[in-house]
Regions:
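Active-site neighborhood of HAD-like aspartate-dependent phosphohydrolases
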Residues: 15-98
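Glycine-rich phosphate-binding loop signature in dinucleotide/nucleotide-binding domains
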Residues: 42-43, 130, 176-181
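Short, basic/glycine-rich phosphate-binding loops at helix/coil junctions
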Residues: 90-107, 147-153
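Short, acidic loop-to-helix structural element flanking the phosphoryl-transfer center
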Residues: 95-96, 108-134, 141-148
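Substrate-recognition "cap/lid" segment bordering the active-site pocket of phosphatases
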Residues: 140-183, 190-196
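Short acidic-hydrophobic, aromatic-tinged amphipathic segments that line or gate anion-handling sites
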Residues: 159-165, 223-233
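Acidic, Mg2+-coordinating phosphoryl-transfer loop and its flanking beta/alpha structural elements
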Residues: 184-228
């Protein structure tokens, strides 16, 4: 449910459109390449690549607040948005065709004001003494500045990349820039899988901040570590860094 969407990563998936049967884990959207290439990264220094929604920011709580203003509610019976957002007056689900506009409205209204996940800023601040940090989020490109401002206001001032689609290709390109240990945190299993296929050495952390979502999904099969708490994610990263001499 990360990246302000259900377990997909694009507006089309939110709308109910099916992703391609076998998406390329190495694919990278053309809008992402210049964002990565513009980053100032130090070769030989470890890199932490973190998702935003349900990892750094409380997406679900923010979405529920927004839905309330629209006369809607989230019937959280599965790890998805399409089919689970219902009208309060009729209890009918919002049709898939209306989901893109609904989510666009949410982005415009709420991207800048989502609450931070407890412990995220403190953990990344400590880890930044030993590693570089980049936020890789499937937020619409036009909302990138708002996302950066929101994270910065919460004490998370690191560069933001507005991704589109799976994240394997982006992480692989980032890893090639640093040639050092890479850690990837995300709540979406198929994002973790795409990174596992695109850059096998990456340490994969399945992080879901909201306990309701965590109970619905369970650990991703390709993750090396699963948690809902930043203190535990920090310990895992610190131990791996120490084991690799950093």
């Amino acid at each position: 449910m990360s990246e302000a969407r259900d377990p997909g990563a694009t507006a089309g998936e939110v709308a109910g459109a099916r992703p391609k049967p076998a998406p390329d884990p190495l694919a990278i959207d053309e809008s992402v390449i210049p964002q990565i290439d513009a980053l100032t990264l130090t070769r030989g220094r470890p890199l932490i690549v973190s998702d935003a929604d349900e990892v750094l920011l409380q997406f679900l709580v923010g979405l529920e607040r927004y839905l309330e203003t629209q006369g809607l509610w989230l019937d959280l019976t599965s790890f998805a948005l399409t089919g689970n957002i219902r009208r309060r007056d009729t209890n009918e689900p919002v049709p898939p065709s209306e989901m893109p506009a609904l989510m666009d409205g949410f982005f415009v209204a709420s991207t800048h004001e989502l609450d931070v996940v407890p412990g995220a800023a403190e953990a990344l601040d400590a880890l930044s003494e030993r590693a570089q940090v980049v936020v890789l989020t499937n937020v619409p490109l036009e909302q990138k500045a708002k996302r950066e401002a929101c994270l910065g206001a919460h004490g998370i001032p690191w560069p933001v990349i507005a991704n589109k689609g799976l994240k394997g290709g982006a992480v692989r390109r980032l890893a090639a820039r640093v040639e050092a240990p890479v850690f990837f945190l995300d709540d979406i299993p198929h994002n973790l899988t795409s990174v596992a296929k695109a850059h096998m050495p990456t340490h994969l952390i399945h992080f879901i901040a909201d306990p309701r979502l965590s109970k619905l999904l369970g650990p991703a099969k390709d993750s090396h570590f699963h948690t809902t708490e930043w203190s535990k994610a920090r310990t895992f990263i610190e131990e791996k860094l120490a084991a690799e001499g950093f």
